[in-house]
């Protein structure tokens, strides 16, 4: 029998560690004397709060601003604030334990959607229930996923073009109506005269028309920019293969689908075939690759570093 390691003995004698408590206890303890937000008679009533969590406390892995909220309320709030434009797809052919970690990271970086490819049942252990706050879609194959994603992008482009058309028609109608009103005023059809000798109602009408046209023009510019982003959308696979591009020099498109494979085999041949680009994380040690879950986190954060604003 080996003698106890001296470091281990010293560690036991150190009195460490002391961990801080995460989350909040029951509402009555954390907010003594304050009305409960789930009480219909309370001026602080808020439908987003969960009665069970208020009773028992909230130790979930959520941001403090979501303490005591229902799962649905949190999900709706994330949607309302706007999720990021990247999506995550994970191949589930081997029931890899890393999938849960990838889903958790996708939640942390507020991915628009998570796609599980392959069997419907996946290893949720590492997700720590974060999938409840995500939009998760299932696909039987990579081919079906890619077709679905391209169709969604095409649909969004069509919707944006329709929006641009409506804005252009609105601007044209406002300008035409204003020009017609000015013509009438020039013929003496307007009434009220201001101190400057100009027609007051015509002046106000002109300002309103200019403002409305400017708003419509700005909307058209926003739509054009959005269409360019959608047209530049790409499917990006993460794997180390000949011809892959180092992530450190890769410019991630704002709208993209990130493909991740399983620990060991990596991505399937079909996934690599259908991807627009393949990127890899540069390795400087002796190993060929890092853990699949860690690699996915690095890739998602690379997108965040290039496109996302700093979190509040």
Where are each of the predicted segments found?
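Post-transcriptional modification and biogenesis factors for structured RNAs
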Residues: 1-312
């Amino acid at each position: 029998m080996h003698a106890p390691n001296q470091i281990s003995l010293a560690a036991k004698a150190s009195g460490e560690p002391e961990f801080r408590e995460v989350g909040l206890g029951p509402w009555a303890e954390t907010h003594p004397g304050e009305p409960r937000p789930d009480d219909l008679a309370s001026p602080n009533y808020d439908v987003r709060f969960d009665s069970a969590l208020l009773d028992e406390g909230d130790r979930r892995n959520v941001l403090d601003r979501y303490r005591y909220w229902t799962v649905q309320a949190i999900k709706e709030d994330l949607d309302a604030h706007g999720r990021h434009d990247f999506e995550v797809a994970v191949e589930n052919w081997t029931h890899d334990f890393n999938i849960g970690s990838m889903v958790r990271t996708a939640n942390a970086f507020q991915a628009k959607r998570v796609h599980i490819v392959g069997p419907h049942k996946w290893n949720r252990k590492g997700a720590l229930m974060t999938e409840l706050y995500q939009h998760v879609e299932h696909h039987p194959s990579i081919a079906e996923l890619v077709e679905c994603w391209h169709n969604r992008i095409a649909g969004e482009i069509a919707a944006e073009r329709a929006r641009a058309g409506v804005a252009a028609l609105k601007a044209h109608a406002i300008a035409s109506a204003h020009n017609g009103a000015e013509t009438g005023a020039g013929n003496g059809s307007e009434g009220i005269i201001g101190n400057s000798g100009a027609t007051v109602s015509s002046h106000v009408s002109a300002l309103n028309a200019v403002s409305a046209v400017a708003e419509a023009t700005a909307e058209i510019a926003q739509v054009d920019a959005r269409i360019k982003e959608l047209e530049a959308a790409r499917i990006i696979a993460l794997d180390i293969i000949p011809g892959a591009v180092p992530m450190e020099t890769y410019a991630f498109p704002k709208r993209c689908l990130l493909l991740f494979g399983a620990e060991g085999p990596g991505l399937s041949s079909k996934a690599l075939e259908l991807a627009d680009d393949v990127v890899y994380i540069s390795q400087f040690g002796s190993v060929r690759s890092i853990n699949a879950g860690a690699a996915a986190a690095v890739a998602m954060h690379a997108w965040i570093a290039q496109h996302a604003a700093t979190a509040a």
